[in-house]
């Protein structure tokens, strides 16, 4: 299948590595897979500012708790890069929180990003700190999903050693597109497939 190939320790689409969200150093913007266009089109959307992030979350271009949290984290970074003013940042943070008021990951990611803002630092330094923190949130999510995959693989192996056929049922938005890479409940399935 064109969307699920983990042979290279990542999700591939047409043999090209993709994550659901990433920071592009060249264009200095955040990029996402626009999930409203799937499965018929693969559209990469650039998030250049706070408004772009708000639209991406509200219009469900990004879906799944971990991905929404990461997008919100990048939203704090992009808002600071754009605004730099303390009062305007407080308003921007509230706008981000209002995009999905029940999304727990969104709130903890925003609070984590806000905890890194120290207005006694130079603006460029704060920007760098916020970008590093948003990227760190993404890396931590990928690491969590990989660990879920590794641990889940052991469970699948143990069960499949006892039976010939194994059916796995997942629910909710637990796949690759809900996280940065791998997925939560689906990560063990990907690991099992690649490790026969």
Model-found features: residue ranges?
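Short, Lys/Arg-enriched N-terminal segments with co-localized hydrophobic residues
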Residues: 1-10
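General secondary-structure edge motif
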Residues: 2, 33-40, 93, 132
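Positively charged, low-complexity intrinsically disordered leader regions
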Residues: 11-51, 55
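N-terminal active-site beta-alpha-beta segment that forms phosphate/nucleotide-binding
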Residues: 61-196
């Amino acid at each position: 299948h064109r969307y699920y190939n983990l042979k290279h320790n990542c999700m591939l689409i047409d043999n090209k590595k993709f994550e659901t969200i990433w920071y592009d150093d060249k264009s200095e913007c955040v990029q996402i897979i626009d999930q409203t266009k799937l499965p018929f089109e693969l559209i990469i959307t650039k998030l250049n500012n706070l408004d772009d992030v708000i639209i991406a979350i509200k219009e469900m271009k990004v879906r799944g708790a971990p991905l929404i949290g990461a997008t919100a984290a990048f939203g704090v970074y992009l808002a600071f890069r754009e605004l730099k003013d303390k009062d305007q940042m407080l308003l921007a943070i509230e706008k981000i929180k209002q995009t999905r008021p029940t999304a727990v990951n969104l709130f903890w990611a925003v609070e984590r990003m806000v905890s890194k803002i120290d207005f006694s630092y130079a603006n460029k330094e704060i920007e760098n700190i916020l970008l590093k923190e948003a990227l760190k949130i993404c890396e931590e999510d990928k690491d969590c999903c990989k660990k879920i995959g590794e641990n889940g693989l052991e469970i699948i192996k143990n069960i499949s050693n006892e039976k010939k056929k194994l059916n796995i049922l997942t629910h909710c938005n637990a796949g690759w597109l809900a996280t940065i890479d791998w997925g939560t409940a689906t990560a063990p399935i990907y690991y099992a497939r690649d490790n026969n």
